[in-house]
Amino acid sequence: MNKEQLEKMTHGKGFIAALDQSGGSTPKALKEYGVNEDQYSNEDEMFQLVHDMRTRVVTSPSFSPDKILGAILFEQTMDREVEGKYTGDYLADKGVVPFLKVDKGLAEEKNGVQLMKPIDDLDETLDRANERHIFGTKMRSNILELNEQGIKDVVEQQFEFAKKIIAKGLVPIIEPEVNINAKDKSEIEKVLKAEIKKGLDSLNDDQLVMLKLTIPTEANLYKDLADHPNVVRVVVLSGGYSRDEANKLLKDNDELIASFSRALASDLRASQSQEEFDKALGDAVDSIYDASVNKN
């Protein structure tokens, strides 16, 4: 583990850019960027176009390490190059800490939740991540209803994988998303917090994790998770809120910082001139940074 990057992730001012749309969500991400499905004829072309989009984001002067602490990449992105360097090295050289999405998507809903599908090649992926100088990982589950067994299963699965990731020298971001439209969202979050606390308490002193959570209904609910000795940082997802709404809610939560994907890229278009693109990205970065750093 890179100690300088750990220091930046623990104490740095800023947020994490989530650039990890995978195969399933890529057509939608490209469409929002203004690239329609008739502009590519196969998956290779699609992934090249999305890599071009991400390259445009990370090479922009608006993608500044003064405001962006880290970036989460999709596996394809990790294996591709930006300006002649592997993406992780390009980011690290720029001062942005690289993370890798390692989950294989969500299983069918059961007990009001979606667990992660099995990650059969996890060891191999983590070895490649280490070769590519990746600092940490991210994996997402989804909680849809207040079901204590389901929530417990989600958290147990996350920590089970987290321990394997830590053993390989990486810092896992544990992401048990709570659907923002869940009927009992506030109650779900209280159960989730208690389960996460149990998971954290099961770790040894040197086993560090990060948490990526839905912005809680009750402000500052997760503050004591952020203060837990095994937690490097708690970040939040935008989860379907508009950028303005997500930023507004984030400002009410001390110590939590953003890890936004759609809310970061929502105003970016393929047709923009470089100047327009840099300004749109810069405006998004500035507003998300402000919500992460300057609290109410």
From Swiss-Prot:
S-S pairs: none
Database matches in Pfam families: Glycolytic
Record key words, sorted: Glycolysis, Lyase, Schiff base
Pathway(s) per entry: Carbohydrate degradation; glycolysis; D-glyceraldehyde 3-phosphate and glycerone phosphate from D-glucose: step 4/4
Gene3D superfamilies: Aldolase class I
GO molecular function, one term: fructose-bisphosphate aldolase activity
Catalytic activity: beta-D-fructose 1,6-bisphosphate = D-glyceraldehyde 3-phosphate + dihydroxyacetone phosphate
Record EC number: 4.1.2.13
InterPro entries: Aldolase_TIM (IPR013785), FBA_I (IPR000741), FBA_I_Gram+-type (IPR023014)
Catalytic residues, chain numbering: E175 (proton acceptor), K212 (schiff-base intermediate with dihydroxyacetone-p)
One GO biological process term: glycolytic process
Family membership: Belongs to the class I fructose-bisphosphate aldolase family.
HAMAP family: FBP_aldolase_1
The protein, known as: Fructose-bisphosphate aldolase class 1
Originating species: Staphylococcus epidermidis (strain ATCC 12228 / FDA PCI 1200)
Phylogenetic placement of the source organism: Bacteria, Bacillati, Bacillota, Bacilli, Bacillales
